From Swiss-Prot:
GO CC terms in record: cytoplasm
Annotated protein name in UniProt: Histidine--tRNA ligase
Taxonomic source organism: Streptococcus equi subsp. equi (strain 4047)
InterPro entries linked to this entry: aa-tRNA-synth_II, aa-tRNA-synth_II/BPL/LPL, Anticodon-bd, Anticodon-bd_dom_sf, His-tRNA-ligase, HisRS-like_core, HisRS/HisZ, HisRS_anticodon
Assembly: Homodimer.
Name of the encoding gene: hisS
Length: 426
């Protein structure tokens, strides 16, 4: 049997991983500017953490979860999204306590798991960057969080990003709209897909989110949820829109956008860009004011978003965005003969301890092959060590671009390499 990675997973090799690290680094720096701290939750949770929060009727729970019973007969699931585990942690660790400063701002970066058909930018194990903000019902929090995502995309160089915006209102608004949608769709039930016929009974708003052609036709003239917002919900949405305009963040209203998770209320949003003449969602999120209470905590407003790293990197690649990655080695040490092996080891370590990236030959190859390795690694400086260098206590440093050389003592290299390096590459 040929051993291979499971379907829908990937090996992220060093060249690609450098791009991942760059994107993750920009995200961390951006979130830090907005005073977010990192949280790391388990990759698996009790099944109820996900099923109760995400919604029993969602595709995630009914079709896509990796769940199993462990040896203690506990129902466990690999996390399919990041918000529910973070909310569970917020409640379990009592981050709602009065001594904890509010709002509590958290971000996460990690693997998620969904059993779905693998395709470009979508895998069964995928990686998500997400943020959650707890404790503020202020519409300014909605806008700040949306602006943070927009800021991140600007820093990464993503082109032509469009913000799609909608409001699901509060519980009363959603109840009124739910009934209006049932009244509108019921006469055309037989024309809906089988999934949407089921959704019409369980959660009719999800019909709006369907990708099936027949469902899109059915909802084309459906009533708008914005017509059913009560005074409180309308005021919140109006405030969000006006503050987005203050920050000069353009948006379009998308009344058919409901998001695929059941816990949202009030503001929901997606950032969409065009790739190969197709629209791709980069990031999505919204407000979830009832979720903390649902997990057994006090009533606590929340707002957040998630974005898929694989899709983000795909979009950057398709749009031709060049990510700055590792520039190569500072130093490559060419080793001539076994006599120089120990000295090369000591010198390599001494230079690394002064903050430089260094590689050396371990394979006993001919000098020409070692110089080719130095070129392949894009080494700035090459140091050649052989028997004569060790006997004299001096090494030859060569600028790998200009080929200019300088001779320096081992003592100088071991104690003041920064000055020597700067002189060599100037």
């Amino acid at each position: 049997m040929k051993l291979q990675k499971p379907k829908g997973t990937q090996d992220i090799l060093p060249v690609a991983a450098a791009k991942w690290q760059y994107v993750e680094g920009v995200a961390r720096e951006t979130f830090k500017q907005y005073h977010y701290g990192e949280i790391r939750t388990p990759m698996f949770e009790h099944y109820e953490v996900i099923s109760r929060s995400v919604g029993d009727t969602t595709d995630i729970v009914t079709k896509e979860m990796y769940d199993f019973y462990d040896k203690g007969d506990r129902h466990i699931t690999l996390r399919p999204e990041g918000t529910a585990p973070v909310v569970r942690s917020y409640v379990e660790n009592k981050l709602f306590a009065p001594e904890v400063q509010k709002p509590v701002k958290l971000y996460y970066i990690g693997s998620m798991f969904r059993y779905e058909r693998p395709q470009a930018g979508r895998l069964r194990e995928f990686h998500q960057i997400g943020v959650e903000c707890f404790g503020s019902a202020n519409p300014a929090t909605d806008v700040e969080t949306i602006a943070m995502a927009y800021h991140l995309f600007e820093r990464l160089g993503i082109k032509e990003v469009t913000l799609h915006l909608n409001s699901l209102g509060n519980a009363a608004s959603r109840a009124a709209y739910r009934q209006a949608l049932i009244d509108y769709l019921s006469p055309m039930r037989e024309t809906l897909s089988k999934d949407s016929q089921r959704r019409l009974d369980e959660n009719p708003l999800r019909v709006l989110d369907s990708k099936e052609k027949e469902d899109k036709i059915a909802v084309a003239n459906a009533p708008s949820i914005l017509d059913y917002l009560d005074e409180e919900s309308q005021a919140h949405f109006d405030a969000v829109r006006s503050m987005l305009e203050v920050l000069a963040i353009p948006y379009v209203i998308d009344t058919n956008m409901v998001r695929g998770l059941d816990y949202y209320n009030h503001t929901i949003f997606e950032f969409i860009t065009e790739v190969d003449q197709s629209e791709l969602t980069i990031c999505a999120g919204g407000r979830y004011d009832g979720l903390v209470e649902y997990f057994g905590g006090p009533a606590t407003p929340g707002f957040g978003f998630g974005l898929g790293l694989e899709r983000l990197l795909l979009i950057l690649d398709k749009q031709g965005v060049e990510l700055p990655v590792e520039e190569g080695l500072d130093v490559y040490i060419a080793v001539l003969g076994a006599y120089a092996n120990v000295a090369a080891l000591a010198l390599t370590q001494a230079i690394r301890r002064q903050g430089f990236t260094v590689e050396r030959d371990y394979l006993g190859r001919k000098i020409k092959a070692q110089f080719k390795s130095a070129d392949a690694f894009k080494a700035k400086v090459v140091i050649t060590l052989g028997e004569s260098e060790i006997k004299t206590g001096q090494a030859v440093l060569k600028h790998n671009q200009t080929r200019q050389e300088m001779t320096v003592s081992f003592d100088q290299i071991q104690t003041n390499f920064a000055s020597i390096f700067a002189e060599c590459i100037q």
